[in-house]
Amino acid sequence: MTQVASTNSPLLHAEQLSSIRGGRVLFENLDFSVSAGQLWQVSGPNGAGKSSLLRILTGLLEPSDGVVSFDGQPLNQNWSEYCQQLLFIGHKAAVKGELSALENFHWQQQLSSVQDVDAWDLLEKLGLLGLEDELTTRLSAGQQRRVALTRLWATQASLWILDEPFTALDVQGIALLQQRFVEHLDAGGTIIFTSHQSLTLSGLTPEKLSLEYRGEVL
């Protein structure tokens, strides 16, 4: 059993979570609680189940066993409220392929009514300037991930669940994303993100949940 203690009232609680995929045990009997305003880093090697855990926490994937609760209730009992508070960016970037990089950002702004962001400055800092008019289907996987990350500057969601958000970012992009993390946490937001490698985040000390590659086949 893996258990990480939380001192505050939990926003998100996982109880006895287990995941078995393709006959292989990814993890089992995970217990942890995430409080509002916390930053959590889920780490571990490829194949340890990090992405599966995040998808379970978002409700997109059913656990093999266990329950995820939001604000004291199982996800299936307050799904609508949960979705209003959640922003999920998976390992495979979810972008609208029929829109350009710039249009993707403006589309997200319209959905969230967040307008006080300089889109051109943001695209430049994420290394997307010069690609703003390209359809996202023509961009590389790394470029698409950076387009998806622009959503973090155009959302009012309080809970962010992000799969490998620092992948494909250069030094400037990493610094920019770290600053956005700080802004969101200072505003009372909550972040859960994965990383397959050890990260040193300037000014940030995340709670850590480490998964191991088990390789057990049932």
Swiss-Prot record:
PANTHER family (UniProt xref): ABC TRANSPORTER I FAMILY MEMBER 1
Xref: SMART domains: AAA
InterPro entries: AAA+_ATPase, ABC_transporter-like_ATP-bd, ABC_transptr_haem_export_CcmA, P-loop_NTPase
Primary site of residence: membrane
Coiled coil: none
Family note: Belongs to the ABC transporter superfamily. CcmA exporter (TC 3.A.1.107) family.
Localization terms from the record: Cell inner membrane
Superkingdom per UniProt: Bacteria
Entry keywords, A to Z: ATP-binding, Cell inner membrane, Cell membrane, Cytochrome c-type biogenesis, Membrane, Nucleotide-binding, Translocase, Transport
GO-annotated cellular components: plasma membrane
EC identifiers of the protein: 7.6.2.5
Positions that bind ATP: 44-51
Single GO MF annotation: ATP hydrolysis activity
Name listed for the protein in its UniProt record: Cytochrome c biogenesis ATP-binding export protein CcmA
Organism: Idiomarina loihiensis (strain ATCC BAA-735 / DSM 15497 / L2-TR)
Function per UniProt: Part of the ABC transporter complex CcmAB involved in the biogenesis of c-type cytochromes; once thought to export heme, this seems not to be the case, but its exact role is uncertain. Responsible for energy coupling to the transport system.
Catalytic class of the enzyme: translocase
Membrane topology, from the record: Peripheral membrane protein
